[in-house]
């Protein structure tokens, strides 16, 4: 048996010391002239088509750069920043939307009371089905009440074909994953009847043979409920993605 010292081997590899890792940026004085020059350069990009904007110093309120700032332009999805700001000022960041289900006038029917949660999930429907099964012996029909929203399903100027294109969904107060069909994220085709789809999905879980639109009767018995994520989470997702 040979001793380990008799074994031949290559040269030992030396590991170089790592470079200094990146450090978080720290506040400092900004070169406003250089910033303006860089923004001017970027704004000349022909791919931007018609472009306008302004940059404000948040400490002084002074405008440090602008390009056609007083020109009216189509705002696209940026207007949702104002909607988000208004919501966070008017509502508590922990505010949740509660979707409730009530027993129908027929004791074997249930009615979903849509409340505005357009990001409902399969897990929420599973939860509702489990709660309903404990409170209702047999479910023959599942209906949904959308009376909380009385406005139009399409905003003025919207192209209905954009629903099939996956860019928008009809404005209804209950949706599963924003009305997406066949996926939970992305620009996939959207449903033309997203609230009814919620009722259909819940009906499938309960083995109900009837699904449709309905209304919650006065003094109806609540049989199930689920909560949306808090407003802070919903607002973050709203401004992060161009999801209309």
Q: Which residues are covered by each model-predicted region?
A:
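Beta-lactamase-like hydrolase cores
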Residues: 4-72, 131-138
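Second-shell loop/turn segments in exported
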Residues: 21-30, 67-75, 111-121, 183-193, ...
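Stable alpha-helical elements in mature extracytoplasmic
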Residues: 31, 35-39, 124-128, 167-170, ...
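Extracytoplasmic
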Residues: 48-50, 68-70, 76-79, 94-96, ...
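Active-site SXXK
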Residues: 61, 75-93, 142, 174, ...
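Short, well-structured active-site flanking segments
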Residues: 90-105, 210-215
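Mid-domain, small-residue-enriched loop/turn segments at the edges of structured enzyme/sensor domains
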Residues: 108-115, 119-175, 179, 194-197, ...
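A small/polar active-site loop signature that marks catalytic segments
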Residues: 179-244
């Amino acid at each position: 048996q040979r001793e380990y010292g008799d074994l031949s081997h290559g040269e030992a590899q030396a590991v170089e010391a790592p470079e200094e890792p990146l450090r978080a940026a720290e506040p400092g004085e900004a070169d406003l002239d250089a910033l303006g020059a860089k923004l001017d350069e970027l704004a000349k990009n022909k791919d931007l088509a018609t472009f306008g904007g302004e940059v404000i110093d948040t400490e002084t309120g002074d405008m440090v750069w602008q390009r056609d700032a007083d020109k009216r332009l189509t705002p696209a999805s940026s207007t949702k920043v104002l909607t988000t700001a208004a919501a966070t000022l008017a509502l508590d960041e922990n505010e949740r939307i509660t979707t409730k289900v009530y027993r129908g006038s027929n004791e074997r029917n249930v009615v979903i009371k849509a409340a505005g949660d357009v990001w409902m999930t399969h897990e929420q429907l599973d939860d509702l089905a489990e709660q309903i099964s404990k409170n209702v012996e047999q479910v023959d029909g599942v209906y949904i009440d959308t009376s909380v929203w009385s406005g139009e399903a399409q905003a003025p100027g919207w192209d209905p074909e954009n629903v099939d294109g996956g860019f928008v969904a009809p404005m209804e107060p209950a949706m599963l994953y924003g009305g997406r069909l066949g996926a939970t994220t992305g620009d996939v085709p959207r449903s033309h009847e997203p609230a009814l789809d919620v009722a259909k999905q819940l009906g499938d879980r309960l083995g109900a043979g009837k699904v449709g639109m309905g209304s919650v009767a006065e003094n109806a018995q609540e049989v199930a409920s689920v909560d949306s994520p808090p407003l802070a989470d919903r607002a973050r997702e709203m401004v992060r993605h161009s999801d209309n």
